[in-house]
Amino acid sequence: WKAGKQVEVTADQKVSAYYPYNVQYTDMTAIPVDITTQEDYMYGEGGVSVEKPSAVLVMKHALSLVRILIKKNDYTGDGMVDAVTFGGVRLSASMDVTSGKLLPTGQPGEYKA
């Protein structure tokens, strides 16, 4: 992967990145996150200097996967789970790419998985 344009490095600088990229987002401290899209939001940071002008970025996941395990135990019926709904969940947030911190936005709601 290569950057869209060459940038001269004249001093030590931090380099930040996020995924999925959107050209409309210009504030690296306020990237919109919407969990209903099921996107794998990621962020990363590295550094460059005059001596080392290429950055190595280690991307981290901004969100967690929730895994639900339902055990049958002694139940003898067919049993079928149609859906699982999480309540009191913030469905959107603003991500600071430089730290990975998420600031919840909007009101809590329900999310049907």
Regions found by a protein language model. Name each.
Residues 75-107:
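Short, ordered, surface-exposed loop/turn motifs in non-cytosolic proteins
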Residues 59, 102, 111-113:
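Short beta-strand element of the conserved SAM-dependent methyltransferase core
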Residues 1-85:
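Short, low-hydrophobicity acidic/polar segments
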Residues 2-3, 108-113:
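Short, intrinsically disordered, charge-balanced linker/junction segments flanking boundaries
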